[in-house]
Amino acid sequence: MTENSAVEVDEGVFESTAVIDNGSFGTRTIRFETGRLAQQAAGAVVAYLDDETMLLSATSASKHPKEHFDFFPLTVDVEERMYAAGRIPGSFFRREGRPSTDAILTCRLIDRPLRPSFVDGLRNEIQVVVTVMSLNPQDLYDVVAINAASASTQIAGLPFSGPVGGVRVALITSDENKAGQWVAFPTVEQLENAVFDMVVAGRIVSGSGDDADVAIMMVEAEATDNVISLIDGGAQAPTETIVAEGLEAAKPFIARLCTAQQQLAVKAAKPTGDFPVFPAYQDDVFAAVEAAAAEKLSAALTIAGKQERDDKTDEVKVEVLEQVAPNFEGREKELGAAFRSLTKKLVRQRILRDQFRIDGRGITDIRSLSAEVAIVPRAHGSALFERGETQILGVTTLDMVKMAQQVDSLGPETTKRYMHHYNFPPYSTGETGRVGSPKRREIGHGALAERALMPVLPSVEEFPYAIRQVSEALSSNGSTSMGSVCASTLALLNAGVPLKAPVAGIAMGLVSDQVDGETRYVALTDILGAEDAFGDMDFKVAGTKDFVTALQLDTKLDGIPSKVLAGALSQAKDARATILEVMAEAIDTPDEMSPFAPRVTAIKVPVDKIGEVIGPKGKMINSITEQTGANISIEDDGTVFVGATDGPSAQAAIDMINAIANPQLPKVGERFLGTVVKTTAFGAFVSLLPGRDGLVHISKLGSGKRIAKVEDVVSVGSKLRVEIADIDNRGKISLIPVEEDGAAAPAEQSEEAAAEK
């Protein structure tokens, strides 16, 4: 990495630059500029990635605090402008409307590391608005947005302990380097060869330059959709050890980005304003509450059941507050906050000193597990997963591929065949509240569960269905998102979806403090809701028995030792294995598809026959639909998806389509003298008839011997005598070579002779 710089490029306009060196993968340049745009905002920074991707971040603050608030009113908004990609919005009014899922998830990525960086007790409203103004289609803007938001906040004169640096690192493999290299700010094209991809945010806690000590604050990570095929090709699997290495690899990049922001702040930051802070309570209030409640509350916190424990804790709270309230008139809110702080202190003390938790478990114990499938009668697939008092219902729905979600955002994804929706109704925690459209938290949890399962889903060729997975959090006491991963795996298998491997998830926690003069860290397996709230880290890990598929980390600490993090990952792997065993007892292979699910078959027709299948004004395809009752969807490449409620209806539609588009279907056993038209790593495509090709797999080309490359035996243009070994229900033809002198009559048919028929 080269040195950063901060210069005045015009009167009052300053910029700084961070150059990220990825070795053989090239360099990426992040440039921060302030003083030109949005000058009335408290802080405004334009961030560029290689001068083509451009984001404006503006930070504003209210002049007066909201004294009646008992929380920090920070709002983060991401505005995707379609002009950034040279497009007009597809909505009816042709302008941007509600934020896309990508924008909402980016808001969460920004909020999570920024919020803990503000001083405790701040009650002024702070708003950060990031506008995507230009986007190279090969770039992902979310990590650029993290840096832009941090930079604009850093110069806004706020009590902010930044800057925060954010980087996406991907483990990209190649034929020469199967172990892979961690590449910062990878392009969309480079991610196709990545086995793991993570967004990491952090800040410098000591030192400077690339060797600065960086504290990781937030991680959002996932295995890529291609991970299993890449592993099969010899690539490194993203195990817990590899993930830990990736976090370390991200730190120098974060240091570089933070340094660039610091240098910009030196030139352009406003002096920190006088912002009043409102501590949750004063020391005298805490001392009084502790003296009155410590003994009774300690006893209440040993009750294992959540409901009974909460009831007893509430009883103690009412009793104690009545006892001490006369001494603190007008400070009732402080009393409640002090009681909560005392609860946190006692919970943490028991974990650190006794290695026991509030429900009586040891630090590595998992709550009781239960898994059951086929819960909802007419659903295509359903399952109920329970872990202690957390209960998740997973429901799977299958439909035609044309029902895939159309995505109108700035991201590279235009359709989603697999959709995961997570619902968290208020009754799941025994409370009342608003129900309706999903909140940001629900969207984020659904996206995490979706990413955990994407690597193991079958391709559209293997399973030609659109899949909607819904996770209903019926009862919550810790990590409903990871419970959703488990319930979804069970429901998908119950629906007959051929997953490449089952996936389970577990939530980890961390508690640390000074004990006997040393910093002691205790990692907790399967955390409760209270342990999440009172702990120092929320660490969710999902994966198969062999590798990690998704990971999410948020920490309140200024850095977690690598050894502690590695230990937590190891604990998570052990817990995942235990959960997978319980899930396998409920279902371990795909069930038969539900009679209520549509039967979808994919067949192939020549592209020049698509018009004939559709017919003038859709007459032919409508006729087939009316006669058979099947739904038919035709793709531009000639793939036809036929869906029906029963097999005979689908087959009738397929026969009618083939009668139009494939009138001369070859049969198994026929032989041809064909021409090799394409070679790939797995075989050679041979033209048999006009518009009709078949595949000779590489394993069939060596006359019984193993060959390294297809081109060692045949090349494009070669004549090859072949026999049809199989034709699948999609019309794909599998071929085997045959000897010249053993050819039967059909083998005398050359491609040219067949064309004359």
Swiss-Prot record:
Residues 598-657 form the KH domain. The keyword Phosphoprotein does not apply. This is Polyribonucleotide nucleotidyltransferase. Its EC number is 2.7.7.8. It comes from the Bacteria. Its cofactor is Mg(2+). The keyword Cytoplasm applies. Transmembrane segments: none annotated. Residues 669-738 form the S1 motif domain. Mg(2+) binds at D532, D538. Signal peptide: none annotated. It is found in: Cytoplasm. PROSITE patterns: KH_TYPE_1 (PS50084), S1 (PS50126). It comes from Rhodococcus opacus (strain B4). GO terms for molecular function: 3'-5'-RNA exonuclease activity; magnesium ion binding; polyribonucleotide nucleotidyltransferase activity; RNA binding. Involved in mRNA degradation. Catalyzes the phosphorolysis of single-stranded polyribonucleotides processively in the 3'- to 5'-direction. Gene3D superfamilies: GHMP Kinase, N-terminal domain (3.30.230.70), K Homology domain, type 1 (3.30.1370.10), Nucleic acid-binding proteins (2.40.50.140). SUPFAM superfamilies: Eukaryotic type KH-domain (KH-domain type I), Nucleic acid-binding proteins, Polynucleotide phosphorylase/guanosine pentaphosphate synthase (PNPase/GPSI), domain 3, Ribonuclease PH domain 2-like, Ribosomal protein S5 domain 2-like. It catalyses: RNA(n+1) + phosphate = RNA(n) + a ribonucleoside 5'-diphosphate.
